[in-house]
């Protein structure tokens, strides 16, 4: 009950902090217990555990993406940058006319209350900073922290106001060593806009060493941050390139960094500053605001509040360390950011209700929180998570929330439209933990997986196993799945809520998908590759596309929510929003633009027809929305025809040749060796390569896994050489076909 949450607030908060750190040491406890038991009976122990978490090494993804030169430069730059705490962060203001800034400066005096030398930020229009405004920072002492030189810092915050739509500004700020080189920031449209949705950058998580006050730990931490930050930057750059630099902002579902204060050497808060330096280091973030959410790795260290300037911040939902819930508006959308590291659901309810009531003009309502209450990876079935689910979902439904964006599990999933999920089973965390270890045991010397084993079988006679399986069945929420009107990939006027869980945006850590896909899941994906989503918002539609960072391929179909009253008002608004696309027709592929053009023409005819029925209007809107979502940009570089430099013109990449060998649920590709940088393998279950997947490798033997038995697998291969950081491709091999065993 909500009332009991308030009375148990502190106890539950502590429980959450402990539970969310469990997954990393859970298996060590089980191993230790097993070893003690076996040693007492003089039996040689067998050490088995869950599969290790995956991660992406920056050098590897740079090789795949053809950015090795950038990685080499970054390695050198990091040695200077890693000790610089003065990186600036940009966050959305309360609306599109505002922009929030936060940055550190070294203290000029030991007096925390002194205003001497308070830094300023200058922002103006264009290169010449016309009509510049000067803002004096609001300053707060960064408590309990000092750098390696014993220097202490202040946190500075500024809100720039009066910004105009679709205008380029330049800003400069005093970082303690004078004013920085002016950085560019361009405002975007508020009528139709795009934002990126990312999960768990968790910079520093690829460091496998525990926090000890040793050179070994600090070196490992620095190397991990260097790698994770490069991958994080690669994801941001990919999202910007995908949208032609038209992102208005980024929404992060939490865990910006890895190391909690509790896990730092001597619980020294300053030892996580290197991770914030890595997080804030991407050049893209100098011109791209991020709306951050508090994750469990952020929640116990006040430096989260020093680094980010959150607008409309409330003490409702506060865990007394990093603040509470906040919100902002952009165009016709309301973004509600919850700190669910505080488990007082009554306060979250109060905040949501107050925020919605004060912003009734917003057509779209989007909530972001950290825990994946309808996810599909290792944490998603935990009783702590599902208990939170069943307390929050009625609040979301009562306040007409359209979408809930989450993270925490480092694996992508998208739910069906859900309405009315109810708790049907009481099950404790202790019971769940014991059975989960058994279910996910990957045997001796386990290797990284993307889907966890499911060792507990339905016909098990163990009472504990059956109770575990009954619990899992009870949280599938089959009855909560809403029957919705669909047109292609669009749902029309749903009453339910969409729940999305982002994968890792940096590749610092990946969790396995659970072995039994939940009934409420529409699609899920984990291949241990960083990912991001682009969300396009118009008057009548919210459209989501999700991509892998390394090759920009989609990992899910385009999904849209369309709102229509069945009259021509909504249709005319969508037609008007589509006119800008007509002016850019040359940017799209011929076929996708042809489909869009036909849909637009049809929509105009229906809108002009005074006798058009409600169904005809609604159908025209659906077709136009789907056609817009299906537009494909022309490739910016075409390997066969791209204009090459003198050095590149001399490069000839031979046509690749390969053979296939079928195995059990796998196919091994053997490529004829050539003098090249690597190979790209494309495979699909159909000869037209619809929904094909691509893999890059430097090896001549590559095994495609997790295929369906007795199904055809079509494969083609091409080689590439990397010249000056660019991939030069050869022709594809002939299409090869084999039946999977």
What do the PLM-derived regions correspond to, one by one?
Residues 40-59:
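Sec-dependent signal peptide cleavage junction
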Residues 60-293, 299-321, 350-354, 385-399:
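Divalent metal-dependent phosphoesterase catalytic cores across multiple superfamilies
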Residues 75-99, 642-675, 727-741:
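Pro/Thr/Ser/Gly-rich low-complexity, intrinsically disordered linker/stalk tracts
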Residues 117-129, 675-694:
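Extracellular low-complexity, O-glycosylation-prone stalks/linkers
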Residues 148-152, 693-698:
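Short beta-strand segments within Ig-like beta-sandwich modules, predominantly Fibronectin type-III
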Residues 154-160, 165-187, 210, 215-222, ...:
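Extended active-site neighborhood of metal-dependent phosphoesterases/phosphodiesterases
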Residues 166-167, 704-725:
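Beta-strand-rich modules
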Residues 565-644:
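Beta-rich interaction/scaffold domains
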């Amino acid at each position: 009950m909500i009332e009991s949450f308030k009375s148990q607030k502190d106890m539950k908060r502590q429980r959450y902090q402990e539970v969310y750190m469990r997954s990393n040491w859970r298996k060590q406890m089980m191993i230790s217990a097993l070893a003690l038991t076996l040693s007492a009976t003089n039996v040689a122990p067998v050490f088995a555990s869950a599969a290790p978490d995956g991660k992406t090494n920056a050098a590897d993804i740079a090789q795949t993406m053809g950015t090795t030169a950038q990685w080499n430069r970054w390695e050198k730059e990091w040695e200077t940058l890693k000790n610089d705490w003065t990186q600036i962060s940009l966050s959305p203001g309360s609306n599109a006319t505002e922009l929030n800034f936060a940055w550190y400066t070294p203290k000029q005096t030991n007096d925390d209350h002194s205003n001497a030398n308070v830094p300023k930020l200058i922002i103006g229009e264009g290169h010449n900073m016309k009509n510049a405004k000067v803002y004096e920072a609001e300053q707060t002492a960064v408590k309990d922290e000092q750098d390696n030189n014993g220097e202490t810092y202040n946190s500075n915050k500024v809100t720039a106001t009066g910004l105009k739509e679709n205008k380029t500004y330049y800003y400069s700020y005093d970082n303690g060593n004078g004013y920085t080189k002016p950085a560019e920031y361009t405002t975007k449209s508020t009528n139709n806009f795009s934002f990126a949705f990312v999960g768990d950058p968790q910079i520093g998580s690829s460091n496998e060493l525990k926090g000890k006050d040793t050179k070994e730990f600090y070196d490992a931490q620095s190397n991990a941050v260097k790698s994770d930050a490069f991958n994080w930057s690669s994801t941001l750059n990919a999202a910007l390139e995908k949208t032609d630099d038209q992102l208005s902002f980024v929404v992060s579902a939490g865990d910006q960094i890895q190391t909690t204060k509790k896990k730092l050497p001597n619980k020294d808060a300053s030892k996580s500053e290197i991770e914030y330096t890595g997080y804030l280091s991407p050049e893209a973030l100098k011109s791209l605001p991020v709306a951050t959410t508090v994750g469990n790795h952020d929640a116990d260290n006040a430096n989260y509040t020093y680094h980010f300037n959150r607008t409309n911040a409330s003490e409702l939902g506060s865990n007394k360390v990093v603040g509470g819930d906040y919100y902002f508006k952009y165009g016709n959308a309301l973004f509600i950011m919850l700190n669910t590291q505080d488990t007082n659901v009554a306060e979250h309810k109060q905040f949501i209700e107050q925020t919605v009531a004060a912003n009734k003009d917003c057509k779209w309502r989007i909530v972001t929180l950290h825990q994946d209450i309808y996810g599909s990876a290792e944490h998603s079935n935990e009783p702590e998570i599902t208990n939170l689910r069943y307390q929050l979902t009625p609040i979301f439904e009562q306040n007409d929330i359209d979408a809930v964006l989450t993270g925490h599990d480092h694996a992508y999933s998208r739910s069906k439209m859900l309405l009315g999920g109810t708790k049907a089973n009481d099950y404790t965390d202790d019971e769940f933990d014991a059975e989960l270890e058994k279910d996910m045991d990957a045997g001796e010397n386990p290797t990284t997986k993307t889907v966890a084993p499911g060792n507990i079988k339905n016909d098990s006679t163990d009472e504990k196993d059956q109770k575990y399986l009954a619990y899992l069945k009870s949280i599938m929420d089959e009855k909560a799945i809403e029957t919705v009107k669909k047109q292609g990939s669009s749902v029309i006027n749903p009453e339910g809520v969409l729940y999305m869980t982002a994968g890792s945006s940096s590749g610092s850590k990946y969790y396995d998908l659970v072995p039994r896909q939940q009934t409420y899941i529409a699609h899920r994906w984990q291949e241990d590759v960083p990912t991001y989503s682009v969300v396009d918002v118009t008057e009548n539609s919210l459209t989501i596309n999700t991509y892998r960072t390394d090759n920009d391929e989609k990992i899910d179909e385009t999904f849209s929510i369309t709102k229509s009253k069945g009259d021509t008002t909504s249709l005319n608004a969508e037609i008007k929003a589509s006119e800008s696309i007509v002016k850019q027709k040359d940017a799209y592929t011929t076929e996708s633009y042809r489909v869009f053009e036909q849909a637009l023409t049809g929509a105009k005819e229906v809108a002009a027809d005074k006798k058009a029925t409600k169904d005809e209007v609604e159908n025209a809107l659906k077709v136009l929305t789907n056609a817009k979502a299906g537009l494909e940009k022309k490739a910016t570089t075409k390997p066969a025809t791209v204009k090459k430099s003198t050095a590149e013109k001399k490069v000839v990449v031979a046509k690749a040749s390969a053979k296939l060998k079928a195995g059990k649920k796998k196919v091994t590709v053997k490529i004829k060796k050539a003098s090249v940088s690597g190979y790209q393998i494309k495979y699909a279950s159909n000869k037209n390569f619809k929904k094909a997947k691509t893999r890059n490798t430097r090896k001549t033997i590559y095994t495609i896994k997790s295929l369906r038995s007795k199904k055809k697998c079509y494969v083609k291969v091409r080689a590439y050489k990397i010249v000056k950081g660019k991939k030069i491709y050869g022709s594809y091999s002939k299409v090869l076909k084999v039946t999977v065993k």
